[in-house]
């Protein structure tokens, strides 16, 4: 899933963005995956497996999932946000073929614009998403743990490079998974 890729890249980056090399990152990520008891299909299923079913001792997940679980009373477990972490970029797009077919391009484009307004960003922050609007980010800064340095997929070679290196058939992720069996 997308969440699994982000988690993998966060683990890898926690080594290489802290001065380590690829060999050290491979060992670290391999060691982490040796301890994985369940690989759910997405972030919400991961949360449910951990909080509702008690599977696993540690949950690696999106920050907003942990915040949402706490808000819903599913957990009082403390959580750690690494000081060097990956910025998860959730894309949003208007799909030409669909909006043209349904005649709703104008409202769809307006909605996409709205998502980046201070009003929408404040709502996202309420459920654990870090705002991308600088003003709102300052307003809610105290509600989120400090992160010293965020890196992006671009810092790891961009999506095409990341896909080829880590997630293509026979790439690093497959090799790690084969070692778990």
Predicted regions: what they are:
Residues 1-3, 64-67, 85-87, 98-100:
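Solvent-exposed loop/turn segments at secondary-structure junctions
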């Amino acid at each position: 899933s997308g969440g699994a890729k982000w988690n993998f890249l966060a683990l890898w980056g926690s080594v290489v963005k802290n001065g380590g090399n690829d060999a050290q990152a491979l060992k670290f990520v391999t060691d982490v995956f040796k301890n994985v008891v369940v690989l759910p299909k997405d972030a919400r299923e991961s949360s449910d497996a951990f909080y509702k079913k008690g599977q696993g001792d540690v949950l690696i997940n999106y920050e907003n999932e942990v915040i949402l679980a706490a808000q819903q009373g599913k957990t009082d477990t403390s959580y750690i946000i690494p000081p060097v972490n990956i910025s998860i970029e959730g894309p949003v797009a208007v799909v030409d073929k669909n909006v043209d077919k349904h005649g709703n391009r104008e409202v769809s484009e307006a909605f996409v614009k709205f998502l980046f307004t201070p009003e929408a960003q404040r709502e996202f922050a309420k459920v654990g998403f870090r705002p991308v609007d600088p003003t709102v980010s300052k307003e809610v800064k105290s509600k989120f743990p400090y992160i010293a340095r965020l890196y992006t997929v671009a810092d790891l070679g961009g999506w095409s490079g990341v896909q080829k290196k880590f997630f293509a058939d026979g790439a690093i992720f497959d090799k790690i998974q084969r070692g778990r069996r």
